[in-house]
Each structure stands twice: as C-alpha cells, then as structure tokens.
C-alpha cells in the first residue's frame, strides 16, 4: 500500500542501511533541473573530470555520504541502441556518479527483452521501500510515489538483479 505522506527522497536514502538500487528504463528524460546542462552539452560543452569543483553538486555529496555509511548504491540503465542524444548526455556525465561512489551499468534494451520489468523507473531501498518515479509521455517528472508493498519490492529487486547481471559496467560500455 502506498503512503499518503511519503518521506522525501533524501530521507529515504538517509534511512537506508544496506542497499539503494535504481533502475532507469527511458531513453529520454525532460526533468527541469537538466534543461540547462543538456542544452549546454548539445552546444558542445563537456564536463572536465579534472575540474571537480565545476561539476560536484549536492546530489553527489548525498551519494558519497550514503556510500560512506556502507550502503551499496547501484544504478542500471536500460537503453536502446543506437542510443538517444539524451543517453549520450547521461553517459558523458556518469563519471560524476562513479566519482561519488555509485556503481553504474548499462544494459542494451535488446538484452532485456525477457526480463519481467516494472512499469516505472524506481529506487529500491534495503529491498523493502520503493520510490516509484513517474513521468509524462514527454519525459517530464510526474512526481514520485513511495510504496512498501512486498510483492512490488520483490518484483523490483528481481528485475534489477537480472538487469544488473546482464549489464555492462560503465567503464566498459561503449556508446552505439
């Protein structure tokens, strides 16, 4: 059953003690906070891995603190190939997630055809609490939803682990 007054995402991550897994299944997102960086990237701007001060942000502090507490943070991205322009943008910036301690893998969608996947992207905390990420057809955020439904948590955990086992680590994945 979903909560009427869900905790914030930061609270969920802060309460997490063992694992935080994130499955992304869209080829494009239109979330507000990425409009500027995506436009700059499309114009040719790239982050300089050696200039940490230019790209470090509060999100990365949160991930670094979480990993520092012993929580394993993993993200799997299921992507169509050839990848979308937006996926190229994500790929180019993923080194920041890795620098914060997040493990990231990429799964070509063709290799995910026989995986039973939930209908929405999600975060799953300690194999129990789900934060569903809802999006509009155009990729804008339509809000989140928190659930502790055991069957849904099991589906998410199993889908993620199967995707993770087939996915390519970020440092080995080549954009196609």
Q: Where does each model-flagged region fall?
A:
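PLD/PLD-like phosphodiesterase catalytic module centered on the HKD motif
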Residues: 1-176
